[in-house]
Each structure stands twice: as structure tokens, then as C-alpha cells.
Amino acid sequence: MGYPFRALEKKWQAYWRDKRVFCVSEDERFPPERRAYVLDMFPYPSAQGLHVGHPEGYTATDIYCRYLRMGGYNVLHPMGFDAFGLPAENFALKTGTHPRVSTSANCDTFRRQIQSFGFSYDWEREISTADPEYYRWTQWLFLKLYEKGLAYEATAPINWCPSCKTGLANEEVRDACCERCGAEVTRRGVRQWMVRITAYAERLLSDLDELDWPESVKQMQRNWIGKSCGAEIDFPVDAPACSVHDKLPQTIRVYTTRADTLFGVTYLVLAPEHEAVTALTTHAQRAAVQAYVQRAAKKNDLERTDLAKEKTGVFTGAYVRNPINDMRIPVWVGDYVLVSYGTGAVMAVPAHDQRDWDFATRFGLPKLTVVSADYTATVPNSNSPQGAVLQRCVSDEGFVVNSGAFNGLASADARERIVAHLEMRGAGARRVTYRLRDWVFSRQRYWGEPIPLVHCPSCGVVPLPESALPLLLPETADFTPTEDGQGPLARARTWLRVPCPQCASDAVRETNTMPQWAGSCWYYLRYMDPRNKTAFCAPEKERYWAPVALYVGGAEHAVLHLLYARFWHKVLYDLGLVSTKEPFARLVNQGMITSYAYRRKNGALVPHDEVHTNAQGTYVHARTGEKLECVVAKMSKALKNVVNPDDMIAAYGADACRVYEMFMGPLEASKPWNTQGLVGVFRFLEKIWVLAGRVAAANGIPQDSRAEPPGDLHAQKKSCSMYALETLLHRTIQKVTDDTSALSFNTAISQMMIFVNEATRVARRMPLPSKMWEMFVKILSPYAPHLAEELWEMCGHTHTIAYEPWPQVDPARVAPHVCSVVVQVNGKVRDTFSVAPNAPNEELEQKARETAGARKFLGTQQPKRVVIVPNKLVNFVL
């Protein structure tokens, strides 16, 4: 009989479900070190369903969880759905269905597909962020932020997506476009709710060092937080040069990390949104400045700071004085300066900053050299009597020049001295700033958590009492976004108008909704206690499971979900609601599973159905006959190269798909899908099935194959073969144990393939002992659980293999036959030699002396002492 994978998978998935095999509780018999919370980043349920890339991370965590259970761990492994947000709402708008209906249907599809892989999730803990019983606690947690002063209302220029008709956080903008729909983002002033994530910037930065995360992700967060140590410097306004204005500031404050270049400032640049622009602008320059400010308002931050674009600006007509030397310098407006960073004003040092150089070159402004690689008394400048000698900007540090009493100091020393001088005069002060901006926490859309606040004419903003939660989304047929930035909830008149919770007068509800990230900031906590109606999570359950021991998901969430969740968690920690400072102890980013695509000479990719293979085996365009290059690309509906897991499971089975996805390469690496590789893995499982049949047919086989070889030569050869196979099994167990612990699944599978090939060869000549076979089935079970359960039952067992103890290795069988010993002379490697394990020190020293390297570097000298590390090292100290 062939390998009946369809019947096996249906049988064992029903068994796991009906027997509640993977439902877990807070069993106190497991000590803290034997508890593990393993989590996948939960999916948002798109209409397209899963493609074969989605289950990669899910398969990895499932293998790891099954391995831990067999190792005696109590494992929490849940799954749910990130169901609120723009993707779900945009699909509903496109299809004309209500998002509640379409999202529910999409969740059903995702659940069916995920379950078809046989993942060992505790489905009784399933959550959905769009479930009122869930978002009740999202609203409750938001109110905690509000009470703590971390949520506030503001009208400010934000990233606006004209297609999605909503504001976007900086983290949701990619290359000046909306991350979700790809539309070009503009700037727009909209009333928003903001969350003060900047209050936690330093802790978010410093605590990264404690996390077992990929260094690349930690560095992305460090860069996004963008800590900068510098100084704020006040430039007095030269009042006579400015137009008369009742709000004329006395000084313009700038932030700089290069106070050592203060003598080289030749102009100031204000962001177009800077509050002093109007007051500083002279009458003669007013029209030009106003026109420039209006043009700048249409650009997003990425456009404005693009180094490749030509700098633009306009002179205000105003001047300020340099506080270090009283030089009179002009004030310009330039959109390459952002009001959201530093003070919204920069001191321009074109000789030592490339952006300032480009700006000065464009507008003919002077460039003063004040830092030199080698100190000399004077260095000519572009406006010096010697003429224009500067050919390029030099941003490196060095020694300050043309800087009065500070000449000759190294840049770092000059910074300290100049800032101290300014502080003494009250013209400056040291300051730490961060690139991180407060989080835009509201969306002008329908499908999200309603914000539980009321606007009262008398009382202002009033939070809803806890008894009024959850504040439900109103049922409405018209959920299309508006153009005025108010949001669809403003049209729900009955829902909108409500008595003020504080004074009972007429009030209106907040019409913005929360962003998709709100529900995903804390979902890992709800899994610990998903049915609790009196708290988001009981403290004793949080203490039992926290923190998440292993979190697996995409690196694209580095400065979105992962940063937001860390911030949210730290707030909860400060409120005494969680017991750990960080939510995720270890993070692993799985690589992307890509697909093959075909590229024309002009770089355009061609859909699969337009590609043919000619008689020479070359890929050609079906219509034009043009030769095509086969490349690796992201799976795309447009390219028609998306691989549906339903089709693969139907043809080859869930176990084959699981094993193949892990066998493709290292978990963290991107790799292309190749169905022929899946066929190869399917044949591997078929081979195991055939081998199992041989074992089952050999009833009454001896359980101990380790007896001494008998005298009969033929029997002796058979016994030696079995001994060698058992040795290979123990080495396989060791390899699979080590690699599964390290999430190196591809090499574990390779080792199992080696064992199966050898076991198949041996089994043709003699029966395999059932004890040996059962040990192999155990290590196979995390990888191919359906097949392993059936093989376990064939061995005569009536209970699941899922909680069987992981097989132990016989140390004698895995010890190396020889050791490689390093020979050093005075700590430097000079040679190596091989020796039997645990050789005595006398033998190690003698063999080391006999090596060519030792003879060359010792010569006739006698070492003062010999340092020996058994099995590893001999070091001669002269």
C-alpha cells in the first residue's frame, strides 16, 4: 500500500482536536524553568488566504514546541487574528461587503488553512482583535495611557494618505508612499490623538541590550529612536533688520551635535512650519516666503530630506547674531529642515555639512572652514582674500581652526569648551534629543477600535467609565472614508450624540478610531487568559507564562509592531500590570519564501502564463519570442507565481510541506519555492512509510542489538551492521537534538535522511529492532507529526506520541574517535595533530613536540612550562 497521507492527516488532526491534546493550563507541577511561551506573529486575515510563505514561521515554532513538550516543558502555543485595520476595511470597500462579514469569512479561511498543517496550537485560546470582548480591554488600556498623560489630542501636520483617506504614523510610510496601498503620501493638518512614546525613548533604547534579538532588528530600532547628544544654542535676532511684529522672538534656538563648528556658521535655516517664520519675515520677502511655505506643505518628510534632490529655500530678510563671535548671519527658510526634529531650526555650516554645502552652493552663500585634518594657524575660506579655495564639503572631525581662542583643539575638546563657554553666558546648554516622534494613534476610518472618549462643551475631553466598555462600533451601511478628515463615525448620528459622563449635558463621542497596531500591542498578554471578563489578564497567569520565550515573525515589523509593543509593555510595567520589563525575550525573523519569475531585457517581469520553454530549454516570452532571464522574486498575484498551500497539501500532504519548508535552507534565509524539492521530501516520507512496514512485519524481533558478535562470520557481519546503525542513530539523535534546539531545522532533516537511507539498506538484510525504530519515530515526530503518530500506533501504542519523552543519547556512541589538538608556542597556533580521546598528558606533550610547527618554533629552546587542555590544546611557553 502507498503512503496514505490524506487519511493519516485527517485521522490525527481529528484525534488532536477531539482529545484536546494541545490545550494547556497553568500547571504548577512544572517549575518556572520548565515553562515556555512560544508565539508566532498573528496574521491579519486577507481575502487571498495563506500562500506557502506564511506557514514557514508557523512550522518552525510548531516543531520547536513539540520538541519542548517531549523534553518535559509546559508549552503555551496560541494563535489568533489581527482583524482590525486598513487591509480588512479596504477589501470590504472593494467588494461592497461589511468588514465585519468579510473579516469573519477571511478568518474562517485562515483558520482552516492553518489547521490543515497540523500545527499544535491551543485553539481554545484563539482571539480576534475585532471581537468586542477583546477590544474592550484595548480600550481599557488606552484609558490607562490617557490617565497617565501619555495620550493627548493635537492638530498637527501629519502624513496623509489620499487613497486610504487617513493619517499615517511615520513608521507606516515607505519611500514617501503609504505602506498599505502604495499611494503617494502628502502632509495635512488633521486633529489627531497622539501617544507619547517619546517619554520612553531612553528606556526603549537602553533595554535593547538585554534582548536576545537579531542585531539587525535592534540596530533598526536604535536608528529609529535616533539618540543624539548635542547642544541647544540661542542666536539673538538682529531686530533692526526685521519687520516690526508683536511676536518677534528675541532669539532663535538651534540644536547641533557639532558645536565645534560654531565659528563656521554662515546662515540659519528654519523649517517652513517653524513658529517664528511669519514674525521674522520682512515685508519685502513676505509674498515669496508665504508661497514657499505653501509649496512645502504639499511635500512629505521623505521628499523634503531626500539628499539626491536639489535644495530649495527662500530668504526671510531677517538676520541673527552668532553668539560666539557676534557675526551677522541671514535667516532662510528651507524644507530640508523638519520642524519635528530638534528645534526646527539649524545652524548651517556649509564647509562641514553636505546638505548645508548644497544649499549654500545653490544660493551663493559663504563657506567658512573651521575644522582641519591637521592643525595650521589659518585656513583660507571661500570668502577669504585668497579667493574660493574650497572644492568640497569635509564633514570629518579634526582640529578647529579660524575659531579664535579655541584654535588647535581637537573637535571633541572644542565642543566641550565651546558649550561650556555658551552655558556660562546663558547662550546655550547641553541637550539629548531623539529622532523618535510621538505616535499618531488615531485613524479617520471605520474598521478599528472606537476611542472611548467624549467631547463635552463644558468638561472638555471626558473618558468613558469602565462600566461603559466595550464601546461598540455602530452598525452602519456607509463606512466609506470622508474627505474632511472627520471619519465615517461622524455620520453615525444616533451613536455620535451622548450625555457627558461627567455633567450629563449634550456631548459627542470621539469619531477617530484606533490604528491596527493598538490591538497587536498587547495580544500576547491576552493569550495567557483569553476568557477573563474582569481583567485583561489575571496577574498570576501573567507571572506564570511571561515573558514570551520565543517570538517568530518578519523583520519588516522592526519599527512598527515590535517597537509599539515594547512601549506599551513598559507602560503596563510602570502601572504594575505586568511583571517583566520586556515582552519578548528572544526574537527570530524567518526569511521570505520567494518564487521564480522571468525578466525581460528592459527589467520588466513577465507573468508565468506568458512564459514558454523552447526546444533548447530556454525561457522565452510567449508573444514576442524574447529570451527571458529566470530570477527570484517575491510571490505576486500579478506575476501569477503565488503557490497555494491548499494545492500542495492536497497533492503531497501536510507533513511533506512542513518538512520541505524547513529543509529549504536556514530559517532566517530567504529561499525560492521549488515544487520538485517538495517531491523529493515526499519520497523521503514514502521511504519512511515503507521502512515502517518492514518493522511492523518483523514481529518478535530482539529488543537488544548490542550483544557481542557471535562466532558465525555471517551473523557477525549482520551484528556489526546493526551496531553501526545503532551508533548512527545515536549520532542522529544528538544532531537532531542540537539542531532543533538551535532552530537549525534543515540540517536536522539532512541527518534524519542519512539515517533513513542507512536503515533502509540494513533492513533489506535483517529486521530492525523495535526499540531503535521507536527512538527514530520520536525524533521524527516534531517534523512530520501525522506520520509519526501513525508509526507510533503501529508500534503498539495507544496514546499520542506528543508527550513521549525525548530519546536520550548514549554518550559512548557519540564520542569522537579522534580529537584534533592545537599546538601553540607562546599562545600562537603553530600546528595541530590528531589523537585518541582522553589521551594522557604525557602522550599529548610528546606528540605536540613531534609536530613540524613545534620543532620549527621551539628549536633547541626548552619551554618554561607546558599548558595542556585535554583533548584540545598544548601550549609551550618559552
Swiss-Prot record:
It catalyses: tRNA(Leu) + L-leucine + ATP = L-leucyl-tRNA(Leu) + AMP + diphosphate. It is found in: Cytoplasm. PANTHER family: LEUCINE--TRNA LIGASE, MITOCHONDRIAL, LEUCYL-TRNA SYNTHETASE. InterPro entries: aa-tRNA-synth_I_CS, Leu-tRNA-ligase, Leu_tRNA-synth_edit, M/V/L/I-tRNA-synth_anticd-bd, Methionyl/Leucyl_tRNA_Synth, Rossmann-like_a/b/a_fold, tRNAsynth_Ia_anticodon-bd, Val/Leu/Ile-tRNA-synth_edit. GO terms for biological process: leucyl-tRNA aminoacylation. Keywords: Aminoacyl-tRNA synthetase, ATP-binding, Cytoplasm, Ligase, Nucleotide-binding, Protein biosynthesis. SUPFAM superfamilies: Anticodon-binding domain of a subclass of class I aminoacyl-tRNA synthetases, Nucleotidylyl transferase, ValRS/IleRS/LeuRS editing domain. Its EC number is 6.1.1.4. HAMAP family: Leu_tRNA_synth_B. It holds the Pfam family tRNA-synt_1_2. It comes from Treponema pallidum (strain Nichols). A motif ('KMSKS' region) lies at residues 634-638. A motif ('HIGH' region) lies at residues 43-54. Its main location: cytoplasm. The keyword Acyltransferase does not apply. This is Leucine--tRNA ligase. One of its GO terms (molecular function) is aminoacyl-tRNA deacylase activity. ATP binds at residue 637. Belongs to the class-I aminoacyl-tRNA synthetase family. It is an enzyme of class 6 (ligase). One of its GO terms (cellular component) is cytosol. It comes from the Bacteria.
